[in-house]
Amino acid sequence: WEPAHQLIQLIDPIAQLRVWAKKIVHLHGKDTSVDWDAVSHHGIFAAKDFAPERTPGFGDTNWRDVFSILHENGYEGDVCIEGYHYPVYAGEWEMTSQMHALKYLKFCRGGDFVPNPWDVK
C-alpha cells in the first residue's frame, strides 16, 4: 500500500487506510502533491501532470497519521522508500532526497527507537 496511488485518484489515503489497516502487509514510502489549481481549471485529464510523484516529506500525505493508524492496527513491517520519482532531486541529488525521506519518516513515526528500561519481560 502507498498513499501516492490514492492521491493520484483523488481518494483520501487516510480514510482508506483506516478501513484497510489490518490488511496492510507492505508499505511504500512514496508521495505526491495534488495541484488543486490545475485540477480546478483543467480537470484531471489536462496535459499538465496534476499530481507529480514525490518522496515522503515533499508531498501531501500526513505520514504521522499513516504511522499512527498502522501502529494502532498492529503493523510491524517496514517502509520501503521509493526513489527516482521526484524530478527536483534527480540525478546526483537522488540520495539526498531519499535520505531526507528516511529522516522525515523516522520523525513522523516518533523518532529513533529508544527501548523502555522499565519494560522488563
Short names for language-model regions:
Residues 1-121:
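Histidine-acidic metal/acid-base catalytic patches
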